[in-house]
Amino acid sequence: MAWLAGERWKLKAFADFDAGHGVDLYKATYARTFQVDPADVTKKQRQIGKVMELGLGYQGGVGAFVNFARVYGIDLEGEFLHAVRNTADPSDLRAGEEAFEWQSAQPDYVADLSPDAWAACYAVRTAWRRAHPAITEFWAALGRAVTAALSPTHRAGMMHRAGDHVLVTAYPHGDDLRDVLIRLPSGRSMLYPGARPAYASERALMIFEDCEYSATPTRTYSGKLCENVTQAVARDILVGTMQSIEDRGYKIVLSVHDELITECPDAPEYSHGELSRLMATAPEWAKGLPLAAAGFEAMRYRKD
């Protein structure tokens, strides 16, 4: 996602860590978000940084952050609240308090956090977005491109750019709907069939009215499209390495998320180091994308 959006400080953080002279990403994220020295980031603050990375990257808000925080055992009413109050911008906390007043007045609001903890989560969300201007702009660029593709002025074949690597177009689908295609940097496209612009009351970017995979209309938004694009690009990179891996004599027997499990002769010319190098080879269309891989050798599949 950082590469797609052009978030240069984060790309440098990845590259520095891979080169062995940088802090890990969760510390770097916490430090950048709250403008503190990475060396001063505590173990508990690093855990907050991890939840920020996992929960906020695809336009997640307070709800997404809370869900991930609970998965990773963060006490939002205790140590988290103390850590945020000590490092967050006071104006972000005040904005969080004001946002809570509005949110808590909504008929569908469920009170599962204290006002102070909710405001602290909102402050984290605000600070993370401010620390990632290129990523937040990429969300907006995807939204603008899709909106343009669904607009009355769009004509079949017109391309709308979202950042430096992604193009969006659309083709008619019946009388009122369109098939939206998002072209990835690899040249492959993702299809969103039977789409229309969302109404303001639907709180979405576009709606799929005619989709064989769902009996009811499905809504999506810019952050979710960012997730779709990011995961699709990751897939293209992984699949793109498979042929060279097979050609080198590593028989691929299974893939699990971002892992490849291979079988090969128990001989010195085969190693997990070489396999990692092959997996971390960027394709021609992904110049400037930092890649790293690690692995191990075993007689059966297991987690490292």
Name these PLM-found stretches.
Residues M1-D304:
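Conserved catalytic core of nucleotide polymerization and phosphodiester-bond processing enzymes
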